[in-house]
Amino acid sequence: MTSRKGLSCCILDPTGNITALVEGDVPVSRQPETAARIMRLRPETEQVGFVRMRGADPAEESVKDTEGQNGAPGSGIQVRLRMAGGEFCGNASMSAAALYLYRMGADHSAKSTVTEEPSASDAWTNVFLEVSGAEEPVEVRLREIPAAGPTWSARVKMPKATGIEPFEDMTLVRMQGISHIIIEEGSRFFHLKNDKSAAEAAVREWCGRLSADGLGLMFLERAEAAQRWKMTPLVFVPGSGTVFWENSCASGTAATGMCFSARSGKREELALQEPGGELQVLSDPTTGETWLSGTVRLTEEFAL
């Protein structure tokens, strides 16, 4: 594999939540301004992350950690991802894992077959990432979708909630690196969904009150199809100063699954229709695991 010099930027589409990933050394102090530049170049971008990959450059024996320090060669981490605001992002984790496979030329040396889908054609590749805001390595499972260009089905094992509690007449799900407020139709705050300026003011105020690394407002309502929900995500990240009505929000989807499973005390599997498409979440309070499922597509690459 040839070595790439300088900075490159890849644009990926995980269920409409357009994500830019920068490869190369960018000091943490310069990441917000680099992210702002990319968002000016590609206004459809909703978030920017910075990645280092083990083995993507033949000369690279280890990858720097999310704060720019040298990582241990034997750590087992294949990708390190730091978001521009230092928050955790599930869709960016999915995107970084997909980009890693793309860079490695779909070398399936890390392949493991998911037990519930044992046939060879259903083999998934596991990628382990260190992600800003997450205390433990994040596992992503990917399977390439044939004849769809560089596109993958993906599953992310989401970090556990650190707390689920009432907030006004809503539910607050505290997570590593970001928190989410689930706003259901019966809430007196649900009207904020149709008052964008008031909603954006509220998410900033509540984020400060909660001292959160980032805060999402997840407006949740029943969809027409049975057992399906419609969700409209608004996310504020103080570290990058961004407020976005996102096309999809992976961590917000996971938070909704965690909220429902904590409420029912049993395994919950939900399909959430979001502006950019559908995400699925499976949350099991018995095992404590929450898995998010979606797709990710590589759409563009350019030099910075």
Model-identified regions with their sequence ranges:
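Short, cationic low-complexity segments
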Residues: 169-185
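Extended low-complexity acidic/polar segments
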Residues: 158-161, 171
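C-terminal binding/interaction regions
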Residues: 161-163, 292
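Membrane helix-loop-helix hairpins that form the core translocation module of multi-pass transporters
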Residues: 151-159
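A glycine-rich beta-to-alpha transition motif near the start of alpha/beta enzyme domains, typified by
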Residues: 1-152, 181-304
